[in-house]
């Protein structure tokens, strides 16, 4: 079985809670948790009286101990918490790279806390890419429907940048690289995958009336890619407002799984994350492609407003753990 390293995320958030809730459902796993042993044990003892779900006992888990340097207040953003989560991610990544684990699961971090600690990265994905010496890591969100069993895969061509910066960041070279990553991932599940690419502009440009990128180069880029890769079905650019309609049908009804594509390529962050979160909020898993190992993360944030209360749901973290075991 794939051994996981699990970085515990921002200690002021819900990372410890969702990890312990998820691991309570997978007692046969032998993960390596990376964080502060004393803090994790204290969090467990604080959660026990108010939590209505089972929790894994940290004393029964292997922990790579990286102690906190100062006290952390649940729900409060701080440089100390940012420094801790940054260090825990680094140590967990090193554990995978040196063979102590085969895949990485990361609990959520707060970018503001990282910045306060002097670590100016857009997110964990970019730090992981740096640690691994990779310059082209990509964010893919995957989920399996509990209603139909269909697997929903959406990859982002661009990630944490302002919307105004997307047209310049979106180049033919980037689009082709992202298509290649999506194709490779989807071949795990189907030999001849069907991929769909959303347009950049409303109605995919409306023949140049609402934007020109589709006419100027996106359509030609997709056609050229299809010609070079004939063992797939490539659709696009598809008007964004209808691109994921088939995904909704496939997600909700096992009789319509063929309406969904094997993979979707969104051209910017919210274009892809809106359908993912509408359909699969508790099931979606953030998966990083382009690293020398598989990394997954739950598709939610630090949950500062719920920290220490026992009310956080562990379903998305459990999905992240299961996905890492399955695909890692």
Curated annotation (Swiss-Prot):
<feature type="binding site">
    <location>
        <position position="203"/>
    </location>
    <ligand>
        <name>a divalent metal cation</name>
    </ligand>
</feature>
<keyword id="KW-0521">NADP</keyword>
<keyword id="KW-0479">Metal-binding</keyword>
<keyword id="KW-0963">Cytoplasm</keyword>
<feature type="binding site">
    <location>
        <position position="269"/>
    </location>
    <ligand>
        <name>a divalent metal cation</name>
    </ligand>
</feature>
<comment type="function">
    <text>Catalyzes the NAD(P)-dependent oxidation of 4-(phosphooxy)-L-threonine (HTP) into 2-amino-3-oxo-4-(phosphooxy)butyric acid which spontaneously decarboxylates to form 3-amino-2-oxopropyl phosphate (AHAP).</text>
</comment>
<dbReference type="InterPro" id="IPR037510">
    <property type="entry name" value="PdxA"/>
</dbReference>
<dbReference type="GO" id="GO:0046872">
    <property type="term" value="F:metal ion binding"/>
</dbReference>
<keyword id="KW-0560">Oxidoreductase</keyword>
<feature type="binding site">
    <location>
        <position position="125"/>
    </location>
    <ligand>
        <name>substrate</name>
    </ligand>
</feature>
<keyword id="KW-0664">Pyridoxine biosynthesis</keyword>
<comment type="similarity">
    <text>Belongs to the PdxA family.</text>
</comment>
<dbReference type="InterPro" id="IPR005255">
    <property type="entry name" value="PdxA_fam"/>
</dbReference>
<dbReference type="GO" id="GO:0042823">
    <property type="term" value="P:pyridoxal phosphate biosynthetic process"/>
</dbReference>
<dbReference type="GO" id="GO:0050570">
    <property type="term" value="F:4-hydroxythreonine-4-phosphate dehydrogenase activity"/>
</dbReference>
<feature type="binding site">
    <location>
        <position position="160"/>
    </location>
    <ligand>
        <name>a divalent metal cation</name>
    </ligand>
</feature>
<dbReference type="GO" id="GO:0008615">
    <property type="term" value="P:pyridoxine biosynthetic process"/>
</dbReference>
<comment type="pathway">
    <text>Cofactor biosynthesis; pyridoxine 5'-phosphate biosynthesis; pyridoxine 5'-phosphate from D-erythrose 4-phosphate: step 4/5.</text>
</comment>
<dbReference type="GO" id="GO:0051287">
    <property type="term" value="F:NAD binding"/>
</dbReference>
<feature type="binding site">
    <location>
        <position position="286"/>
    </location>
    <ligand>
        <name>substrate</name>
    </ligand>
</feature>
<feature type="binding site">
    <location>
        <position position="277"/>
    </location>
    <ligand>
        <name>substrate</name>
    </ligand>
</feature>
<protein>
    <recommendedName>
        <fullName>4-hydroxythreonine-4-phosphate dehydrogenase</fullName>
        <ecNumber>1.1.1.262</ecNumber>
    </recommendedName>
</protein>
<dbReference type="Pfam" id="PF04166">
    <property type="entry name" value="PdxA"/>
</dbReference>
<comment type="subunit">
    <text>Homodimer.</text>
</comment>
<feature type="binding site">
    <location>
        <position position="295"/>
    </location>
    <ligand>
        <name>substrate</name>
    </ligand>
</feature>
<keyword id="KW-0520">NAD</keyword>
<dbReference type="GO" id="GO:0005737">
    <property type="term" value="C:cytoplasm"/>
</dbReference>
């Amino acid at each position: 079985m794939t051994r996981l390293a699990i970085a515990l995320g921002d200690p002021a958030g819900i990372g410890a809670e969702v990890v312990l809730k998820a691991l309570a459902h997978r007692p046969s796993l032998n993960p390596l948790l990376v964080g502060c042993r004393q803090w994790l044990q204290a969090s467990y003892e604080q959660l026990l009286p108010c939590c209505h779900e089972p929790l894994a006992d940290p004393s029964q888990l292997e922990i790579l101990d990286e102690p906190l340097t100062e006290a952390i207040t649940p729900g409060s953003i701080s440089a100390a918490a940012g420094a801790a989560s940054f260090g825990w991610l680094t140590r967990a990544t090193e554990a995978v790279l040196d063979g102590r684990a085969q895949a990485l699961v990361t609990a959520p971090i707060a970018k503001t806390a990282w910045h306060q600690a002097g670590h100016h990265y857009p997110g964990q994905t970019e730090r992981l890419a740096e640690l691994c010496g990779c310059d082209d890591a990509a964010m893919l969100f995957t989920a399996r429907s509990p209603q139909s069993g269909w697997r929903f895969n959406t990859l982002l061509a661009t990630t944490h940048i302002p919307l105004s910066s997307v047209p310049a960041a979106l180049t033919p070279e980037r689009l082709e690289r992202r298509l290649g990553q999506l194709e490779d991932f989807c071949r795990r599940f189907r030999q001849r995958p069907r991929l769909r690419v959303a347009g950049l502009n409303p109605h995919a440009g409306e023949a140049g009336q609402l934007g020109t990128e589709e006419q100027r180069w996106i359509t030609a880029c997709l056609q050229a890619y299809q010609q070079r890769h004939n063992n797939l079905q490539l659709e696009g650019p598809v008007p964004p407002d209808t691109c994921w309609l088939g995904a909704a049908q496939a997600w909700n009804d096992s009789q319509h799984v063929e309406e969904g594509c094997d993979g979707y390529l969104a051209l910017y962050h919210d274009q892809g994350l809106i359908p993912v979160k509408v359909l699969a909020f508790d099931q979606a898993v953030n998966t990083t492609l382009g690293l020398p190992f598989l990394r997954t993360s739950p598709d939610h944030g630090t949950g500062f407003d719920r920290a220490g209360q026992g009310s956080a749901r562990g379903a998305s973290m459990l999905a992240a753990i299961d996905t890492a075991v399955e695909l890692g």
